[in-house]
């Protein structure tokens, strides 16, 4: 454990000293790993199902949905159970679970009156109250009505200082989504902000005016699992064509994703190269845009950063070079 902390601590501390500017005590941001999809080829006889809004695919889904519902509704307890579950899901007294970020508690809330949902936040002190007062940042139902599109909120990543956020909205609930930059103070989308068209994209702020992102850049830029395999750096004011490639995974990999950690130690930008659903290689993004592979096992699961040192758990026992074996499940 000491060896792992020493190696990573020295490497990251040295790299931070070389360039990234400290961003203050903004909280850690990490990104969820997507589920690996089945590989698709041009010879796949079911490729037409990928067009989820296509007439043939919709008809196929409706036929099977109708059969399934008929079977479920044949149970005499169906309606009773349906009504009971719906009542629980729409209950206004259920716990509003939140995520602590930028010093506030963020929550996404859906009920019978807000079917598409409310993205909102509250101070920690307010959240501790029995009936907290929420500051609604985005009313997705109102956005649907204003733009005439069935948007589904897929999350947001906010810049240091909480001045801008990258909001992901899926048309109709598909895995693919648009990315639109949002001002949480004026509660409006920026006309000249960072935007990405509908795709399976992954985005995060490096600083207030720079993002690391992966998306569908065209033929050959997605993995066989249909996730981005190229991570680029994009500066505000540049056309997307000017974005520089930082890392490129192989087509057979699951994905390549960026994550950024911020704190008094500065800014740590990492890229995970997903080898399988449970294994990844990790690369540190240097200030000049190059990457450095970190000496940690592929089964490591990064949990965060403390005092400039990465914290990760082990899915398997690991013996660092020159060190002793560290047991499976250890926090390193």
Predicted regions and their residues:
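Bacterial N-terminal signal peptides that target proteins for export
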Residues: 1-8
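Beta-propeller folds
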Residues: 8-14, 19-332
């Amino acid at each position: 454990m000491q060896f792992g902390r020493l190696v990573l601590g020295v490497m990251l501390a040295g790299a931070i000293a070389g360039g990234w500017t400290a961003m203050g005590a903004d909280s850690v941001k990490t990104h969820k790993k997507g589920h690996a999809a089945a590989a698709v080829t041009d010879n796949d006889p079911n490729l037409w199902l990928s067009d989820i809004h296509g007439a043939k695919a919709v008809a196929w889904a409706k036929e099977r949905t109708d059969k399934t519902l008929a079977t479920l509704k044949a149970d005499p307890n169906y309606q009773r159970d349906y009504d009971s579950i719906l009542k629980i899901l729409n209950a206004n007294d259920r716990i509003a679970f939140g995520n602590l970020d930028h010093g506030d508690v963020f929550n996404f809330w859906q009920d019978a009156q807000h079917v598409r949902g409310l993205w909102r936040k509250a101070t920690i002190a307010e959240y501790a109250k029995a009936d907290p007062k929420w500051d609604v940042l985005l009313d997705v139902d109102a956005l649907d009505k204003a733009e005439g599109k069935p948007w589904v909120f897929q999350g947001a990543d906010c810049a240091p200082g909480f001045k801008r956020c990258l909001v992901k909205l899926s048309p109709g609930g598909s895995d693919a989504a648009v990315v639109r930059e949002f001002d949480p103070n004026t509660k409006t989308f920026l006309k000249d902000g960072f935007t990405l068209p509908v795709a399976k994209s992954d985005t995060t702020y490096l600083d207030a005016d720079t993002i690391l992102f992966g998306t569908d850049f065209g033929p050959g830029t997605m993995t066989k699992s249909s996730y981005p395999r190229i991570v680029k750096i994009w500066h505000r004011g540049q056309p997307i064509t000017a974005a520089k490639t930082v890392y490129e995974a192989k087509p057979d990999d699951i994905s390549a994703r960026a994550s950024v950690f911020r704190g008094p130690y500065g800014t740590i930008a990492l890229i995970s190269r997903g080898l399988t659903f449970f294994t990844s290689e990790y690369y540190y993004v240097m200030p000049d845009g190059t990457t450095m592979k970190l000496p940690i096992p592929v089964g490591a699961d990064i949990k965060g950063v403390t005092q400039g040192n990465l914290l990760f758990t082990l899915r398997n026992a690991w013996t660092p070079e020159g060190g002793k074996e560290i047991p499976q499940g250890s926090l390193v």
